[in-house]
Amino acid sequence: MSKKTIVSMAVIRRLPRYHRCLEELLKNDIKRISSKELSERMGVTASQIRQDLNNFGGFGQQGYGYNVEELYNNLTKILGLDKTYNTIIIGAGNLGQAIANYTRFEKSGFNLKGIFDINPRLFGLKIRDVEVMDVEKVEEFIANNHIDIAILCIPKDNAQYTADRLVKAGIKAIWNFSPIDLKVPDDVILENVHLSDSLFTISYRLNEEELFKKLKGETVKVDG
């Protein structure tokens, strides 16, 4: 299990989308926006937006809508993006290297401090000035560098064992890209990300119409 939340996960998962939308509005010099206009941009009902934001105090003004900069700044604080977090990556393969090279995370306050792998041929490799190290050194590194978040990009066979080591070393949050749902203590924050899920959703939607045509054409046989 992962750490319990006060606000529902459905609401929490919409917050980054609101934040991203507001960031684009600011870039386009839009100062205020109504919940109706925001809903059209987001594909979420205006009522849902108001309900979501009311979990944190509301922020809107009747007849005015939302002050874009004020709401953006409030969501930045709510999402904890006004703080910085020390992160490590476990697994320096293609996915691990891609995440390490994604500079947007650093701009959002997620500072990459170390990369670890089991492959000796990768030891010493530098990705954006961060050196790949032996995973056997990870516990000591966590203790000495106050690491907040571990990003797991390794095969599923070693994922749970590695997660157990990370938790024991004091990691309080794991972003898991390994193709397995990890189990962690209740006080550890866990996000399991299965990249194939989104692709499978697309494949379903591509075949949905054909599927239901077949279902409508089938007859139900009753024994007896």
Swiss-Prot record:
This is Redox-sensing transcriptional repressor Rex. NAD(+) binds at residues 91-96. Homodimer. Pfam families: CoA_binding, Put_DNA-bind_N. GO terms for biological process: negative regulation of DNA-templated transcription; response to redox state. Residues 17-56 bind DNA. Belongs to the transcriptional regulatory Rex family. It is found in: Cytoplasm. The keyword Nucleus does not apply. It comes from Caldanaerobacter subterraneus subsp. tengcongensis (strain DSM 15242 / JCM 11007 / NBRC 100824 / MB4) (Thermoanaerobacter tengcongensis). InterPro entries: CoA-bd, NAD(P)-bd_dom_sf, Rex_DNA-bd_C_dom, Tscrpt_rep_Rex, WH-like_DNA-bd_sf, WH_DNA-bd_sf. GO terms for cellular component: cytoplasm. Keywords: Cytoplasm, DNA-binding, NAD, Repressor, Transcription, Transcription regulation. The keyword Protein transport does not apply. SMART domains: CoA_binding (SM00881). Modulates transcription in response to changes in cellular NADH/NAD(+) redox state. The gene is rex. One of its GO terms (molecular function) is DNA binding.
